[in-house]
UniProtKB/Swiss-Prot annotation:
Regulation: Inhibited by the neuraminidase inhibitors zanamivir (Relenza) and oseltamivir (Tamiflu). These drugs interfere with the release of progeny virus from infected cells and are effective against all influenza strains. Resistance to neuraminidase inhibitors is quite rare.
Intravirion compartment segments: 1-6
Claim: Methyltransferase is one of the keywords in the record: no
Location of the region described as Hypervariable stalk region in the Swiss-Prot/TrEMBL record: 36-88
Organism expressing this protein natively: Influenza A virus (strain A/Leningrad/134/1957 H2N2)
GO cellular component annotations of the record: host cell plasma membrane; membrane; virion membrane
Record-given protein name: Neuraminidase
Region (Head of neuraminidase): 91-469
Quaternary structure note: Homotetramer.
Virion surface side: 30-469
Gene this chain is encoded by: NA
Region: Disordered, residue numbers: 325-349
Amino acid sequence: MNPNQKIITIGSVSLTIATACSLMQIAILATTVTLHFKQHECDSPASNQVMPCEPIIIERNITEIVYLNNTTIEKEICPEVVEYRNWSKPQCQITGFAPFSKDNSIRLSAGGDIWVTREPYVSCDPGKCYQFALGQGTTLDNKHSNGTIHDRIPHRTLLMNELGVPFHLGTKQVCVAWSSSSCHDGKAWLHVCVTGDDRNATASFIYDGRLVDSIGSWSQNILRTQESECVCINGTCTVVMTDGSASGRADTRILFIKEGKIVHISPLSGSAQHIEECSCYPRYPDVRCICRDNWKGSNRPVIDINMEDYSIDSSYVCSGLVGDTPRNDDSSSNSNCRDPNNERGNPGVKGWAFDNGDDVWMGRTISKDSRSGYETFKVIGGWSTPNSKSQVNRQVIVDNNNWSGYSGIFSVEGKSCINRCFYVELIRGRPQETRVWWTSNSIVVFCGTSGTYGTGSWPDGANINFMPI
């Protein structure tokens, strides 16, 4: 091969290699650009259309590393869409209730820094349950705990921890409140927090950690709310609030809130005469609440809330085994489903019940006169038949030698049904135990079960003689 042929051959090979390298670089550049722009797109499974990621709440930020010829490209995988809760599954069929949680706050206060609280409740987001309570701005072993029997002071705040975690010094103070309610709409928490002067209180509506709306007292007489969870269906949450006399006519209103903004207010209608401290649960597509009549009835009022047209109806639980305290002996107590029974209506205590076909599950103190002991049972026909008194599946939660207090319901969505759970406030200190100057509580929590269960008693358990004065 002569020199000219060698030059031509070498040149041809070099040109071929250069062309191949150029094509590879173009391919790498095209891949890089494509992946960069697809980083901000998701495939919608319903319509196979490309949707932007930006409006979607990010639960996880996953990064996938792709290696191409020593070139590293980072690609963000779009997360699943977070949806509002609708609670459309049926209610679980249960045989009774099984123990779920107990925080032992008072026992732990004997040797640790635990908040003084009252008015506890439980509520769950789609993945986890939390316990709430209204703190008194002090721990128990602290001179500020003197006088914490009082309900409304400016230092009270709403506390929030994972269920089962006592309210220690690291507990988050969600808002300023001496009355509250909380619920999760599937995307974020809503907290309704009431504080201020008795004659001119303010309710703040905090959504996703931001104050979105507020409303002032409308009757200038202790604006107050549920002291248990509110309920959200398809992005709209509802909460029951009362302003007015605690032992006479008051003004109850049902508020509808969308992402923290009040979108509608409905007045109470129906036959209920007095409403306080409702325990509400989803009954798709609506919401149902069992409340406290602090004026005329020891039978509990019922509020039915239509989430579509904002209409309200109210009545009373039909069961002749009534749920409030104080109350008449079971042999002489009554309820006609529509009206207060005018039997020891004042004062009362927060409680709960829920319908199960024609029957009703309910909880109440064992004592008919004071907040001691706690029991649950089902009343056959208790939701549909006036003065029904056939009791089955009774369980003792706290024996009658120990103090109880408020109780309320919360709902948990399972794979196939919605379970009903309840908590019991276990009050210690004043007014019943005058050796100490404080008033506080722990809680015990039970949930519905379709299985079998045993017996027991789950009181607070603290020896008052071991406690700080």
